Amino acid sequence: MPTQHTFSRELRLLTPEHFKRVFAEPVRAASPQITLLACPNTLEHPRLGLAVPKKALKRAVWRNRVKRVVRESFRLNQANLPAIDIVVIAKAGVKEMDNEELFKLLEKLWRTLSRRCNG
């Protein structure tokens, strides 16, 4: 996998089976606003799936903002992550955070998840 910072199709979880595998036996990293679930994959790179429920974030603009920030954070940190499938679940509290706070929280959670999956 090239070290360029892109977010192409092969870096995403696309099918329900991919998501089910992660939900079956996950390694967790969580905060009150966001939960990250992960499980090892057989590829050479990490993949990302997003779960931003309407129940937690009622307005589409709120959901889209969270997804945009999560994708950007993943794109910039993917080189530091092991070969794992990750599902990011947003909770209601994430709406109160600004983009910078959310970005810092995600970086901390990526590091935690990476440590737990490697060791």
From Swiss-Prot:
One of its GO terms (biological process) is tRNA 5'-leader removal. InterPro entries: Ribosomal_Su5_D2-typ_SF, Ribsml_uS5_D2-typ_fold_subgr, RNase_P, RNase_P_CS. NCBIfam families: rnpA. PANTHER family: RIBONUCLEASE P PROTEIN COMPONENT (PTHR33992:SF1). One of its GO terms (cellular component) is ribonuclease P complex. Consists of a catalytic RNA component (M1 or rnpB) and a protein subunit. The lineage of its organism: Bacteria, Pseudomonadati, Pseudomonadota, Gammaproteobacteria, Aeromonadales. Keywords: Endonuclease, Hydrolase, Nuclease, RNA-binding, tRNA processing. HAMAP family: RNase_P. It is an enzyme of class 3 (hydrolase). Disulfide bonds: none annotated. It catalyses: Endonucleolytic cleavage of RNA, removing 5'-extranucleotides from tRNA precursor. The keyword Ion transport does not apply. It comes from the Bacteria. This is Ribonuclease P protein component. It comes from Aeromonas hydrophila subsp. hydrophila (strain ATCC 7966 / DSM 30187 / BCRC 13018 / CCUG 14551 / JCM 1027 / KCTC 2358 / NCIMB 9240 / NCTC 8049). Belongs to the RnpA family. GO terms for molecular function: 3'-tRNA processing endoribonuclease activity; ribonuclease P activity; tRNA binding. Pfam families: Ribonuclease_P. Its EC number is 3.1.26.5. RNaseP catalyzes the removal of the 5'-leader sequence from pre-tRNA to produce the mature 5'-terminus. It can also cleave other RNA substrates such as 4.5S RNA. The protein component plays an auxiliary but essential role in vivo by binding to the 5'-leader sequence and broadening the substrate specificity of the ribozyme.
